[in-house]
Amino acid sequence: MAVARFDKLEFDDAEDISTGSSTPVQVNAEKDERYWLAMADSQRRVGNHENALRFYSRSLEFDKSLILAWVGQVQMLILLGEFPQACTWSKKALELFPNNPDLLATQSQAECRIGDFKQSNALIEGALRMRGESAYQWQVRGELMVAQKQKTDRYCFDKAQILSKDSLVPLETALIYLHYREFAKAQQRVGLVMEKQSDSYYAWYLMGWCQEKLGLTAAAIRSYRQCIELCPNHHEAQIRLTQLRSGGWNITGMFRRIFRRS
């Protein structure tokens, strides 16, 4: 039987972790939980979700009462596509903090990704009925609407952005849309960030991804170039840019051009 990739969420103390944007991060066990939370947040903001997962987990080794770290840990598992593991760890967290609304939201999102919409809906509705609604809870509610092809997703995601002005909210909303292949909607959310943060290389990378999926090859190349100009060691942008240049054509873009002429 295959061993799950993040079954135990334990990492070696002396492990070097590459950020993909600068020099490797040396994991130092002498740092406290607040340091690792800050590291997790910084890595999350530039799309290094596996590093962020490691740092959330590291912070919990120091203080298992950090609900923010439990929530972040499950969110990163979801973004890494580890949906069964996300369910497992959200349930473990809820054993420690029963009925915490953000932890209920993490389980709801994991259940949604697995395809159990009934359970996902029950969990997120329960979370939203409690005090202290958060942007994340509304993002999960919005994701459930997207997954079920309902038309209230925009309301939910707009509500999330009202509750939090953090640029991470529209960027991670874009990741939700990308997961469900709603590329134009993802592009719109990234665009909101770029209006205020034109120097965000992660936003440029996501914009390039959206444009590539929409068949806007020339625009995607420009976006990836801008990402690399701002962050020369951005490996994912380099790979995507190379693929676009070497591929020479994109079937989605080809059909778009044909239909424009007809």
What does each of the following model-derived ranges do?
Residues 49, 83, 117, 150-151, ...:
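TPR-repeat structural position
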Residues 14, 52, 86, 120, ...:
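Single-residue signature of alpha-solenoid repeat helices
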Residues 30, 64, 98, 132, ...:
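Short coil turns that delineate tetratricopeptide repeat
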Residues 27, 57-61, 91-95, 125-129, ...:
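Conserved structural position within tetratricopeptide repeats
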Residues 45, 79-80, 113-114, 146-148, ...:
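Register position in tetratricopeptide repeats
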Residues 34, 68, 102, 136, ...:
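Start-of-helix register in tetratricopeptide repeats
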